[in-house]
């Protein structure tokens, strides 16, 4: 996704009709308190799409851990699983387990 893309905000009849069985989401960063985005329009668009998905998967590489940004888009319990490229620090392992979020990474 182009990080400079502009997404509609507000009552959009087209996006309101979307429903997803499974949706994958990216983010700009995560920390112990949640998931973040840098753009107001992207943050609101992702929040709206999250409400329309039955299952939500967060895709986050190791460079995004311990990185906060302007707009919080959710909490870990909002997602069914987190997919990353390597095993995160133990404090995140404990957090995902506590929040009942499946963690997937290559061994």
Task: Report each predicted region and the residues it spans.
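Conserved phosphate- and dinucleotide-binding cores of soluble alpha/beta proteins
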Residues: 1-107
